[in-house]
């Protein structure tokens, strides 16, 4: 998949650094993709651009960079563009169409009306839910059998 715009959302803002490190290790060095985030956990980190800096890089270098963006679920739910009572922030996320939204740690905090509202406001083609412990979602039948991929430590041996 040659996704142009990817958004990673998690209920744990503290794992932002892990996503950034994996991006650097596996993607940044081989693809014309930039990492974009305005979350406090990533402010000032090398290689992390604000959305405005991303747009300027595309214009100034006359290059169509692809984007991997990171935002916390709390950040989305605090935005007027994704919540009924939010403040004016993250308009750039509301304005974009994402080829893929990755919901990391999807067993946490995504089964709420506010989250449903936020995700419903987002323009996205595909959603990937990641979880190491999706017990509730599987028990409820949230996903069809062909939508579930299992991998265990035993599979790595």
Put a short name on every predicted segment:
Residues 2-28, 32-34, 38-40, 73-75:
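Conserved Walker A/P-loop ATP-binding site and its immediately adjacent core
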Residues 4, 67, 99, 125, ...:
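Conserved acidic residues
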Residues 7-9, 68-72, 100-102:
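Structural motif
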Residues 22-26, 84-87, 116-117, 141-147:
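Short secondary-structure boundary/capping segments
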Residues 30-84:
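Inter-Walker segment of RecA-like/P-loop motor cores
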Residues 73-80, 87-129, 133-136:
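SF2 helicase catalytic motif II
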């Amino acid at each position: 998949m040659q996704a142009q715009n990817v958004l990673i959302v998690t209920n744990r803002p503290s794992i932002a650094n892990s996503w950034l490190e994996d991006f650097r290790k596996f993607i940044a060095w081989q693809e014309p993709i930039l990492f974009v985030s305005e979350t406090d956990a990533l402010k000032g980190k090398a290689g992390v651009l604000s959305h405005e800096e991303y747009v300027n890089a595309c214009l100034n270098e006359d290059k169509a960079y692809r984007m991997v963006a990171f935002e916390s679920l709390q950040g989305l739910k605090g935005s007027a563009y994704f919540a009924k009572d939010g403040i004016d922030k993250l308009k750039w996320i509301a304005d974009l169409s994402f080829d893929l939204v990755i919901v990391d740690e999807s067993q946490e905090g995504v089964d709420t009306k506010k989250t449903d509202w936020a995700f419903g406001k987002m323009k996205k083609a595909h959603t990937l839910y990641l979880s190491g412990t999706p017990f509730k979602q599987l028990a409820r039948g949230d996903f069809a059998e062909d939508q579930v991929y299992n991998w265990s430590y035993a599979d790595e041996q």
